[in-house]
Amino acid sequence: MSFKPFVPFRILSAYTMLEGAIDPKAMAKLAKERGFPAVAIADRNGLYGAVMFANACKAEGIQPIIGTLLGVARPSRDEGAEGKQVDYLPLYAQDEAGYDNLCHLVSKAHLERPLEFEPHVRIGDLDGRTDGLIAFTGASEGAVTRLLAEGQQSHA
């Protein structure tokens, strides 16, 4: 019985503290052993191991997919409250433009926020920065899932 190729998209590396456990180089080796044609790294608010991961995948003959779980603040009508509630949007680069946009958004998430809040961007920060990106919205930490779970169907 033959299996259709499977591509894991939601792997957090050891660079995502307290959540990921695998070294990006080991991820590539394991992907080859398991017969995956491609594998994605998606660290939280970071691209820390992206270059190491891409090089290791290429050495193993595996297609690397670079992504991140980007924190996106929920809009708030209360002044000073934006950034207190952050949902996560998995974003993946499909080309060089997408990688450039990922780098910009991750940098913005860290540099343009109050230090008391976790790294995030505002939804409007995505405007003009979506070329070459693929977004998944069904994650358990995503806005749609969380809003539905909170009974806010009209906002989801």
Annotated model-derived regions:
Residues 1-156:
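Phosphodiester-processing cores and adjacent nucleic acid-binding clamps
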